[in-house]
């Protein structure tokens, strides 16, 4: 495979400790000319669905790259370490559903391998820091152009772990949908496609709260609840100048009913 000058890096490691720096150090030692794009390291700890959503929303706008992602509550267990080829990119991380939405956003999984080649890994693999000792070294070697097949044996894509399909239920006067993510601003992204808003009127209800269907935040007065199609094409609920998640009392995995008002 041809070398790539880019690695993207997404984790739940936070910024208070040295975990991100340690992984950057591994990458810099192995492939010092490769540029690293830090997508985020503030995924809520262990929140695989949030990490998957952030990664999937980012990769279509990144250059062709090796996408290194670690949100890994099962680190050190029997869960597989994997790398995937998808579209013009490669993805490296745990086999826990984290990578598959991003792979789909890139065009779908073309090949998958389990990361078992000891020559590609750190000298001493910690049971609790696979980001440093497995995933970062593999990402670096792939960025240098090493063949994906050399990382380990092929994995049948149908056996990869998938996240549960979130609920979306169309109804006569609206729909019920699972909360996918809550972003930094408190905006609530639903699993529902924006197309589900098309038949609904401007005046809506989100559960018992009155809301307005609009194009953007400033279409309503400050403090008003609004429903719109977000930048990824999903239905989102927001408050102009406020936090919809706090107003509605919801977190990812909860369900919201959106109906004609």
UniProtKB/Swiss-Prot annotation:
Q: S-adenosyl-L-methionine: present as a keyword of the record?
A: yes
List all membrane-crossing ranges: none
> Which Enzyme Commission number(s) are on file for it?
3.13.2.3
Entry coiled-coil feature ranges: none
The Gene Ontology terms for molecular function here are: hydrolase activity
Hydrolase as a keyword of this entry, yes or no, is yes
Q: Which domain of life is it from?
A: Bacteria
Question: What SUPFAM superfamilies does the record tag this protein with?
Answer: Bacterial fluorinating enzyme, C-terminal domain, Bacterial fluorinating enzyme, N-terminal domain
- PANTHER family tied to this protein: CHLORINASE MJ1651
Sum up the protein's function in the record's words.
Specifically hydrolyzes (R)-S-adenosyl-L-methionine ((R)-SAM), the inactive form of the ubiquitous cofactor SAM, into adenosine and L-methionine. Is stereoselective as it cannot use the active form of SAM, (S)-S-adenosyl-L-methionine, as substrate. Likely plays a role in preventing accumulation of (R)-S-adenosyl-L-methionine in cells; maintenance of (S)-S-denosyl-L-methionine homochirality is important for cellular health given that the (R)-form is largely inactive as a methyl donor and can function as an inhibitor of methyltransferases.
Question: To which protein family does this belong?
Answer: Belongs to the SAM hydrolase / SAM-dependent halogenase family.
Descriptive protein name: (R)-S-adenosyl-L-methionine hydrolase
């Amino acid at each position: 495979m041809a070398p790539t000058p880019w690695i993207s890096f997404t984790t739940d490691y936070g910024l208070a400790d040295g975990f991100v720096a340690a992984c950057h150090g591994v990458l810099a030692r192995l492939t010092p000319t490769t540029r690293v794009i830090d997508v985020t390291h503030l995924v809520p700890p262990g929140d695989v669905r949030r990490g998957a959503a952030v990664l999937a929303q980012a990769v279509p706008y990144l250059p062709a790259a090796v996408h290194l992602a670690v949100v890994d509550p099962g680190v050190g267990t029997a869960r597989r370490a994997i790398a995937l080829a998808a579209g013009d990119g490669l993805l490296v991380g745990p086999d826990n559903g984290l990578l598959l939405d991003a792979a789909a956003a890139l065009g779908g999984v073309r090949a998958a391998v389990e990361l078992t080649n000891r020559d590609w890994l750190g000298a001493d693999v910690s049971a609790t820091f696979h980001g440093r000792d497995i995933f970062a070294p593999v990402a670096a070697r792939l960025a240098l152009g090493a063949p994906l097949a050399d990382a380990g044996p092929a994995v049948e894509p149908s056996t990869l772990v998938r996240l549960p399909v979130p609920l979306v239920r169309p109804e006569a006067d609206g729909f019920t949908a699972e909360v996918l993510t809550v972003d930094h601003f408190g905006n609530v992204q639903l699993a529902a496609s924006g197309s589900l808003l098309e038949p609904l009127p401007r005046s809506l209800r989100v559960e018992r709260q009155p809301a307005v269907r609009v194009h953007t935040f400033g279409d309503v007065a400050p403090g008003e609840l609004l429903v719109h199609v977000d930048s990824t094409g999903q239905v989102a609920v927001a408050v102009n100048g406020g936090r919809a998640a706090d107003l509605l009392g919801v977190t990812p995995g909860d369900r919201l009913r959106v109906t004609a008002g």
